[in-house]
């Protein structure tokens, strides 16, 4: 093995130069992992995980022994001064800090605390060639005997005390993205990804059906749930939380103050309700909330972290609110209720969509802010424009503790490679600015869906540990794809170089976007197509990680190419030409054919996967209704992420209707005028392009719902066996269609 220096520079990290190297012949079959005599649950949990990874790498059993065992030929001792008599205190006292030192026959990994021991162990494994990604791991071959030139001397600590993720399970849809359809194995992979990447914080949405059924046993239907049986969902949550805590991940419960489901509301018909919220001027709100939160904490345990989402009072965009108290007064009620339930509560409130600093000026000093960087101004108006937030802290008093949350997805019809505020360079600038503020305690990702962009997740995990202004796509490519790094970069480098997305809109309200015909937009599309062709040449010799990345890239370029052809055909029609939409149709059809080959991207396949677990709520119609509403039709169709069903039943149908509209108008010697759009967001370099955006004809909504409900009903009632992996087949003609000529501007009726 080549000598590696293994110096990891982190914010607030003290890295000491490596000692002079000395060659050792290491027999990987004699590798042992050594735990302290008083090892914590966290230390033992990650040692068990590391043993499995090392066994995969070495092809041999790896012993896990106590430090009282006789010394071996190659021992890796992991612990803290509290857990092991052989581990000395390290210089850094920061939680999560670690020190790695020594060489075979003994490497010692010392943590400032148990989390630090965990972090040091996985950092050591990365030095040996392991890499940990959301969708799988890179496991090196450590076989037989090897000459190892390695002596380690490293100490590092994280820039942010809390580093992590938010896994949101509000939507139903493709299994890859929607935690609502995850089983225990899916959750375990997500939590292991976090632990292995030295993350320690998770915003978690606790299921409340079982809790509410316990508090309100007379309420009808709470024992069933909307998709899973309440008991089953509750049991899964308990397992997930226990596993997270065993891996050193603290969980913050996200809670709404005032919201209760209909069966509970029915018990109190004489109280004043508004859109599911109990109006806060009534003392019953605090009483019912405290009962609910008390049972929640008793049933699921707590790490004393809570995010209060208060949507029942004034100035809320999601509902017609109660206005009997101010929003600040409602929050103060929630704080008081939570502190009675948990006197050690660490309460947070999001800045997202709020008026700051006004709201926070009324809060106690111990309430933390979670500053959600959203990336679009006037987000709830008809047209969001440009950038909303600056880097670093929000406009809050300097003594207010806060955490930085990165909202990395906003377009359900985007393919999660580009969004409005989250290319790597943008994230890095904010991380550096946030780390420089001593009041900032944490840095985490809010991906809205889960397991979305592997690249951005990797960037955020690294930035949370050690902010840098220049995340390296090249280094990421080498770590993830090894010898196939250059083909990967051929496809992704032009897209990532382009930076933040310039346009987004809700997927079922798809728009015609002439900006995609601008020269710069066409240049990006042309470069990405060339890169995709390069990636295609290597698919047969690639890993599942490479195939996933290719499908993501292919999806981005197909979506962009189809929209480009649509815009060009329509503008040609406006100019009086007879046009065809065949290039757009061929592109959509090719994309549909690819997405159908990836089961975890299908909405119907997600329903099958849930049904296979055998814990569906009673009544297929109710579950079918939940999948339709929360997977396809909730909030103006917003959750409809890119899936084969979306292409087949929405996007192709919209194209057919556009073509019919245009051809009929042309035969009459007229121009088919399209409506001006509803909501969309843009960051066009020339704002005049926004005036040319138009609304495409809507799909046949009745047919879409009918077909989807029928497919969901069948999937839920007769779940098939899990799909088997198969080789991806492609039609390269998509990448060979002649692109339109660029346009400098567009004027539409």
Q: What residues fall within each predicted segment?
A:
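N-terminal export signals
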Residues: 5-23
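Glycine-rich, histidine-containing beta strand-loop boundary motifs that form or position
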Residues: 10, 66, 78, 110-112, ...
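Contiguous, structured surface segment used for ligand recognition
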Residues: 24-160
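Solvent-exposed, acidic/flexible segments
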Residues: 39-47, 114, 180-187, 230-234, ...
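Catalytic domains of carbohydrate-active enzymes that cleave complex glycans
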Residues: 440, 465-742
């Amino acid at each position: 093995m080549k000598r590696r220096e293994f110096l990891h520079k982190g914010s607030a990290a003290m890295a000491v130069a490596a000692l002079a190297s000395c060659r050792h012949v290491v027999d990987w079959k004699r590798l042992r992992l050594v735990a302290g005599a008083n090892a914590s649950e966290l230390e033992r949990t990650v040692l068990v995980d590391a043993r499995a990874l090392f066994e995969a790498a070495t092809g041999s059993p790896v012993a896990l022994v106590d430090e009282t065992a006789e010394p071996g030929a190659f021992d890796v001792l992991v612990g803290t001064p509290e857990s092991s008599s052989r581990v000395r205190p390290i210089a850094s006292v920061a939680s999560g800090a670690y020190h790695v030192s020594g060489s075979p026959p003994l490497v010692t990994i010392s943590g400032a605390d148990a989390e630090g021991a965990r972090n040091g162990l996985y950092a050591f494994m990365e030095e040996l060639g392991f890499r940990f990604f959301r969708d799988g791991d890179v496991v090196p071959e450590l076989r037989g005997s090897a000459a190892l030139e390695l002596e380690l001397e490293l100490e590092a600590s994280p820039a942010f005390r809390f580093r992590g993720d938010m896994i949101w399970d509000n939507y139903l849809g493709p299994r890859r993205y929607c935690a609502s359809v995850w089983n225990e194995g899916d959750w375990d992979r997500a939590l292991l990804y976090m632990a292995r990447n030295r993350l320690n914080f998770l915003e978690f949405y606790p299921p409340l059906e079982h809790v509410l059924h316990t508090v309100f046993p007379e309420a009808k239907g709470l024992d069933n749930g909307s998709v899973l049986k309440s008991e089953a969902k509750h049991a899964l949550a308990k397992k997930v939380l226990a596993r997270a805590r065993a891996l050193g991940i603290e969980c913050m419960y996200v809670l709404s103050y005032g919201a209760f489901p209909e069966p509970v509301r029915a018990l109190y018909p004489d109280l004043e309700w508004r859109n599911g919220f109990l109006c806060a001027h009534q003392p019953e709100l605090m009483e019912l909330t405290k009962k609910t939160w008390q049972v929640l904490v008793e049933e699921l345990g707590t790490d004393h972290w809570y995010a209060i989402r208060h949507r029942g009072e004034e100035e809320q965009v999601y509902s017609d609110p109660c206005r009997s108290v101010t929003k600040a007064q409602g929050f103060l009620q929630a704080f008081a209720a939570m502190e009675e339930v948990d006197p050690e509560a660490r309460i947070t409130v999001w800045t997202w969509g709020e008026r700051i600093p006004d709201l926070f000026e009324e809060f106690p000093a111990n309430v933390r802010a979670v500053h959600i960087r959203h990336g679009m101004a006037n987000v709830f108006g008809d047209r969001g424009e440009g950038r909303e937030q600056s880097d670093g802290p929000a406009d809050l008093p300097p003594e207010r503790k806060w955490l930085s949350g990165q909202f990395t997805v906003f377009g359900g019809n985007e393919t999660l490679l580009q969004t409005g505020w989250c290319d790597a360079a943008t994230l890095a600038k904010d991380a550096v600015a946030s780390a420089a503020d001593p009041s900032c305690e944490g840095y985490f990702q809010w991906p809205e869906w889960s397991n979305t962009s592997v690249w951005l997740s990797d960037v955020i995990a690294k930035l949370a540990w050690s902010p840098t202004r220049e995340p390296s796509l090249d280094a990421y490519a080498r770590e993830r794809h090894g010898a196939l790094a250059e083909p990967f970069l051929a496809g992704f480098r032009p897209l990532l170089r382009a930076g933040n997305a310039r346009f987004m809109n809700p997927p079922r309200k798809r728009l015609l976007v002439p900006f995609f015909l601008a020269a710069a937009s066409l240049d990006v599309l042309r470069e990405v197509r060339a890169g995709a062709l390069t990636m295609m040449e290597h698919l047969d010799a690639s890993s599942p990680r490479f195939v996933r990345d290719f499908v993501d890239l292919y999806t981005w370029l197909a979506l962009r190419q189809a929209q480009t052809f649509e815009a060009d055909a329509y503008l040609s029609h406006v100019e009086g030409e007879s046009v065809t939409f065949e290039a757009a149709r061929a592109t959509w059809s090719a994309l549909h054919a690819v997405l159908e080959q990836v089961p975890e991207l299908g909405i119907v396949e997600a329903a099958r996967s849930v049904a296979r677990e055998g814990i569906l709520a009673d009544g297929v119609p109710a579950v079918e209704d939940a999948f339709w509403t929360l997977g396809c039709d909730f909030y103006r169709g917003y959750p409809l992420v890119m899936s084969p069903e979306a292409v087949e039943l929405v996007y192709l149908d919209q194209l057919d209707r556009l073509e019919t509209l245009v051809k009929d108008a042309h035969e009459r010697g007229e121009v088919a005028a399209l409506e001006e759009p509803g909501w969309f967001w843009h960051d066009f370099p020339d704002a005049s392009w926004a005036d040319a955006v138009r609304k495409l004809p809507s799909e046949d909504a009745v047919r879409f719902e009918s077909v989807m409900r029928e497919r969901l009903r069948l999937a839920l009632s007769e779940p098939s066996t899990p799909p088997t992996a198969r080789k991806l087949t492609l039609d390269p003609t998509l990448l060979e269609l002649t692109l339109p000529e660029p346009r400098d501007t567009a004027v539409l009726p």
